[in-house]
Amino acid sequence: MKKKFLSVLLIVAVLIGMAGGSGRQTESGEQKADKEQKQQENEQTAETKVEIPPENEEEQKGWIGVILNGDETEAYTLAHIDGIRAAAENVSLPEQDIIWKERVGANDGCKSAVKDLIRQGCEIIIANSAIYEEAIKSEAEKNPEVDFVVINDSKTQSTVTEDGTELTNLYNVHMDTYEASYVAGVTAGMKVAKLKEKKKIPAKSFDEKKNVKLGYVAAEANDDAHADINAYYLGVKAVCKKVVLQVEYIDAWNNSDAEATAAGDLIRSGCVVLASNTDLDAVMQMAENAKERGKCVYAVGRNSDMRQMAGKAALTSVVSVWSVYYTELFDAKLNGRYMEQNWNGGYAQGAVTISTLGKSASSGTGDRVKKTEEKIKNGKKQIAYFSTRALDGILESEKGQEQ
């Protein structure tokens, strides 16, 4: 409406000008063209001004700031995004109260993100990776009025600074995924046992001791990875004793090429089932590609249900239910309740699980998994946190229990 009104006024003004000038000397063609051009420019300027938005638009203000090492295209990061959103919904927290920072670098990148989030009013800052541990600790010391949460790769992390100061605003979180890794191992063991029974395992997939070869790709050789690897291996052995697990450490969390290369090496060496502790899904994709080429290869995924991308190869996935922790955190902060500074969550808390079994899982696996999970939940079965690195990257069937 504003545009129409302005245009009408301008047209009326032109008509009046033309009528008033009828007794004047006739203008030259050049002068007339000049006037028409200026008139056109004035019309455009008037209309453009109506559509210009306010220059000083209010900046987003938040209550929770989230620092992510990836984005929603990566399984690990997406699991956190989904968990935080679900938790926000559980406590009726508006989406606009959350400010996201994606693909943030460690150290300086993290510190810069923290400063920006505090400037925007965030009172809780969550960092979803252990790469931010030192930077977050430093910022927590400088900003005691802000609560900091960092996801760690070890069950025990200190909230004390080098000079002995206790940081009451620093919260360490660890998911006991090794418990779910054990259950995933049971799933893999059921598959291997069935393949052996039906004599479908090729000769190259046995070592010289007649153990079936399994493969594992790990991002880093840290305590958490070792605990997951060992628990997974022992889960397999609970069903199928004669197995050997070959482990490839790639020293990278977000490197799909490195993941794919390691997975390819394991497949070529004859590994029947692959598993991983990485942020991406390249291992599962490599297993699916090999399966489509007729190879005897299956896989256990990580961080999310991967059946959609690997319908033939996927057996299950090890999953952290992040909404459990984030709901507890948000609820405690909203209602002034105590929150543990070192939080560990496993099956008992509903914080870890395995995803829905894939079509390739062996018959009877569901019942076996259900019984195993119940025993872990009620404490009848304790899954040990073995954090010792496997010797030479290999867990042999005779030495698995001691690893």
Say what each PLM segment does.
Residues 29, 34-403:
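A residue-level marker of the well-folded mature domains of exported/periplasmic proteins
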Residues 2-25:
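Sec-dependent N-terminal signal peptides of Gram-positive bacterial secreted proteins and lipoproteins
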